[in-house]
Amino acid sequence: MTTNLSNRHRDTLERIFSHPSSGNIEWRQVRSLLEALGAVTEDHAGNLTVTLGGETEVLRRPHGKDVDQQMIVDLRRMLARAGFAAAGR
């Protein structure tokens, strides 16, 4: 399901699913990936409502530029449920 993604988006997806997880995945990269994969809306506080594969999740914008480990776990779960995975998985 990742064939229509740009190289940049595929790289971000790979880093989300990598073990051990990367500590330097930027929020803007995650947001761009999610916008390429599904429907994304942003509220006035900067939180994203993401709909992928019929499921909707709300992601809170991190305080820094990088996403934390818990958000990476949440992203893996959300993406896996929607049928997305890193290449070779």
Where are these regions (language model features)?
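Basic nucleic-acid-binding interfaces
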Residues: M1-R89
